[in-house]
UniProtKB/Swiss-Prot annotation:
Its EC number is 4.2.1.33. InterPro entries: Acnase/IPM_dHydase_lsu_aba_1/3, Acoase/IPM_deHydtase_lsu_aba, Aconitase_4Fe-4S_BS, Aconitase_4Fe-4S_dom, HAcnase/IPMdehydase_lsu_prok, Homoacnase/IPMdehydase_lsu, IPM_dehydratase_rel_enz, IPMI_cat. This is 3-isopropylmalate dehydratase large subunit. Binds 1 [4Fe-4S] cluster per subunit. The gene is leuC. GO terms for molecular function: 3-isopropylmalate dehydratase activity; 4 iron, 4 sulfur cluster binding; metal ion binding. One of its GO terms (biological process) is L-leucine biosynthetic process.
């Protein structure tokens, strides 16, 4: 029987043919955690008396949520994890100077057809290269770290086709918000979303990573882009090898199908306090903005900063603006291309590789009564700081234009 991408990956990982609804044990290709969740993962392992890993090469650890540590407790957590890394001789450890876990997985480790589990909900980001990637709780990740296995209920597969080419200032965030606006945040529960791109070059890896990252906001079990030449080129460019490609079979059965015409999209925002409270930018244009955040594992990549730099070049922001590329490699490339200089000259505060403001942790927490425009993934009440703050989610073009004007602004005003 023809299989979807989801069914193919889980069949390979379980060693038997699977169908939606099956509960199977699968081998994991990567198990990962970061500083904020790593403490709990290690605690579970210690309590079980099983402080060991199934394969040192398949464990990935990164410091990002508490990087650099904003308080003594954060520093203590990182010290404990460094000790764990040293004792177990884990090679794929990335300290506070490397980047956000999900970006690191995308840049260095994830491959088409992989099963990836990590102790963070935005693990779905690795679906951009066609990996079945899920965020799990600390106990399940601890079990995967020890045994190299986890259990999965095989989800139904939902097919989305992207047609055409996106217009100016449109990127992956607008596609993610389009899906959330049309289907709402609970529609895809128990499903895996598989996205096909009719013209692969029209929707590059940066855009795909944003959409996959927000798969968890759609309550999808996974969100994967079907691998194509863009996938191959990305991995070959970043890692120097050509990956094996896994694609669904012709005639595979999907629970439903949906098409998005990229050429018809306009800039979208998610208004407070829900990711599916989606509006066109024109519906909220003119609202005063106190702070703008451009970055995170959702929109902290080169194309995001290219867009922001084009809008901000030679100008000064009117709102506070924080810009955080998702990794050191991205920060360095953005410097080489002049984007960091442009943002700094425009009055932005720039660092790299920290989750900081996204989770209301540090480096730009929202105060009472403040309105934030953010390229991150969530706008729940209190997500970025005060419960009395409001967060509007948007792509980098809306964010940069809003920082420039000090109010929510349609970027199409800038040619």
């Amino acid at each position: 029987m023809p299989q979807t991408l989801t069914e193919k990956i889980l069949s390979r990982a379980s060693g038997k043919s699977v169908a939606p609804g099956d509960v199977v044990e699968v081998k994991v290709d990567i198990a990962a955690f970061h500083d904020l969740t790593g403490y709990h993962v290690i605690e579970v392992m210690e309590k079980a008396g099983m402080l060991k890993v199934f394969d040192k090469q398949k464990i990935v650890i990164a410091f990002d949520h508490l990087a650099p540590p904003p308080d003594v407790r954060s520093a203590e957590i990182q010290t404990q994890i460094r000790k764990f890394v040293k004792e177990l001789k884990i090679p794929n450890f990335h300290d506070i100077n490397v980047g956000i876990l999900h970006q690191i997985l995308l840049e260095k480790y994830a491959n088409p057809g992989y099963v990836i589990v990590a102790a963070d909900s935005h693990t779905t980001t690795s679906g951009a290269v066609g990996a079945f990637a899920q965020g799990l709780g600390a106990s399940d990740v601890a079990a995967a770290v020890i045994t190299g296995k986890t259990w999965v209920m095989v989800p139904q597969s939902f097919k989305i086709m992207l047609e055409g080419k996106p217009g100016k200032w449109i990127n992956g965030k607008d596609v993610a918000l389009k899906i959330l606006g049309d289907f709402k945040a609970d529609y895809f529960n128990g499903m895996s979303i598989e996205i096909f791109v009719r013209e692969p070059s029209a929707f590059p890896m940066d855009f795909r990573a944003t959409v996959s990252n927000m798969g968890i906001e759609m309550n999808a079990d996974a969100l994967m882009f079907v691998p194509d030449e863009e996938t191959v080129n990305y991995i070959k460019t970043n890692r120097g090898y050509e990956p094996n490609i896994v694609r669904p079979d012709e005639g595979a059965k999907y629970v439903d199908e949906y098409t998005i015409d990229l050429g018809k999209l306009e800039p979208l925002v998610a208004a407070p306090h829900s990711v599916d409270n989606v509006k066109t930018v024109n519906e909220v244009e003119g609202l005063d903005v106190d702070q703008v955040f451009i970055g995170s594992c959702t929109n902290g990549r080169i194309s995001d900063f290219e867009i922001a730099a084009k809008i901000l070049k030679g100008k000064r922001v009117k709102s506070r603006c924080i810009a955080i590329p998702a990794s050191y490699d991205l920060f360095k490339k953005a410097m080489e291309l002049g984007y960091i200089e442009t943002l700094v000259n425009a009055g932005c505060i720039v660092t790299y590789g920290t989750c900081g403001p996204c989770l209301g942790g540090h480096f730009g927490v929202a105060g009472p009564g403040e309105t934030i425009v953010s390229t991150s993934s969530r706008n729940f009440k209190g997500r970025m700081g005060s419960n009395d703050s409001k967060v509007y989610l948007a792509g980098p073009a809306v964010a940069a234009a809003s920082a420039l004007q000090g109010k929510i602004t349609d970027p199409r005003r800038f040619s």
